[in-house]
Amino acid sequence: AEHGFTGGYTIVKDAVRAWKRSHQEVFLPLVHPPGESQVDFGEAIVKLGGQETKVALFVMTLPYSGAIFVQAFPRECTETFLEGHRQAFAFFSGVPRRISYDNSAIAVIKVLQGRERKLTKEFLRLQSHYLFQEHFCLVRRANEKGHVERLLGYARRNFLVPVPEVASLVALNEALAERCRMDLEHRTRGKSGSKGDPLVEDRAAFLPLPKQPFEARRIEQAS
């Protein structure tokens, strides 16, 4: 054979597979200190006024304690993104110091180098009111926001099965908030005590809620 190589195709294929395996990126488990959160949107089907309806689920989780907050909205948009934060901060009685996001167009105008982002004016308005630090996941690094994605699936299985039948979104969200409160009594896997125990440490690390309420609506400047 050319260059003196006498090995077969299978040997080459096995060698390439071994090289790829040895060079695969390894995602180490992330360690989350108290006072941090992750945010995401998902979807679910509910019966609203007798009609099957797809709703958008705003989810905020606290990885340290495992606490979760879920609310349903007609759709994912700037207004529901802002309102979801406002309600989550009220539910948790404080503001997480750092919040992790994907690169949704609601918050990000342009992805720059590394973690640098050009942010939308509405996201900056939210951040300047509550003073939390933003953290945007690197592209194709799903593990950086894995906690909220896992708990989104958990909420679908445990809060929305069987398919809830409600008269209104208000009624659905009251039920979801109650399920989130009840979930604080559950044990966290691998830990002693309930989720409510480490939530005390989360809250101790939170920023205080601002005295002035936040206007969770898109603000357009008059031309």
Regions found by a protein language model. Give the residues of each.
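Short, basic interhelical loop/turn and adjoining N-cap
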Residues: 2-11
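Mobile-element integrase/transposase regions
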Residues: 14-68, 76-84, 215-223
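Short, conserved catalytic/metal-binding motifs centered on acidic residues
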Residues: 40, 66, 99-102, 127, ...
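Active-site beta-loop-alpha junctions of metal-dependent nucleic acid enzymes
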Residues: 70-98
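Acidic/histidine-rich, metal-coordinating catalytic segments
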Residues: 95-115
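RNase H-like two-metal-ion nuclease catalytic core shared by retroviral integrases
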Residues: 101-102, 113-114, 134-156, 170-172
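RNase H-like polynucleotidyl transferase catalytic core
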Residues: 122-123, 128-145, 164-166
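Active-site-proximal acidic segments at structured loop/helix or strand boundaries
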Residues: 152-223
